[in-house]
Amino acid sequence: MFDLRYNPGGDLDAITEVLDYLLPEGPIVHIVDAEGKEEVISSDANELDVPMMVLCNGSTASAGELFTCALQDYGKAEIVGTQTYGKGTMQTIISLPDNTGLGISYRMYDPPYSENYEGKGVTPDYVVELDDSLNDKNIYKITDEEDNQMQKAIEILQNGSEKFHVKKAS
């Protein structure tokens, strides 16, 4: 289970390296620069064939969304939570003399087969809002037992999923 809730993204090279271990042969990401030049990063034929779950929410962004969407595109994971943020761009930060910075988007990245999620986000397979009673609680202090999104993911793993041909645990 990958808990990507509140994950703002990260290093594209790192995420594609991890996805290469998880996905079958095929595209991981299509990167398009400002001139329209496209680069495709692909996975080899070595894949991990186990049931996978991803937890996401409106604070899952950028490379976290690519990870979520790539697993979803290949039918390798069930996605539980709420719509992600919607950031399908790569940025560079230019430091300014007043100690502020300017973020400039310079590339778009598209998931393997889905449309770019820029401004839209990734829709989970199971839309599950975090219980209202937990909204004011520090996410890191919510136990697995009281986390209804986590409990839904565990329920799917225990009961099986047609998506990745998992039989009910005995």
Briefly describe each language-model feature range.
Residues D13-E17, L23, S62, L66, ...:
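Extracytoplasmic/secreted proteins, especially bacterial periplasmic and envelope-associated proteins
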Residues D3-P8, I31, E129-S170:
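C-terminal recognition in membrane/secretory proteostasis and scaffolding
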Residues Q91-I94, L102-D136:
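Conserved P-loop NTPase
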Residues F2, M52-L55, L71, S114, ...:
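Terminal peptide-recognition signature
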Residues Y74-K87:
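Short, well-structured beta-strand/strand-turn elements
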Residues M1-D3, V29-I31, P51-C56, E78-G81, ...:
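Structural recognition of the beta-strand scaffold that forms the well-ordered cores
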Residues P8-S62, T89-I94, D110:
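Gly/Ser/Thr-rich loop/hinge elements
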Residues F2, V18-D20, T68-Y74, S95-L96:
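Short, solvent-exposed amphipathic alpha-helical segments in soluble enzyme
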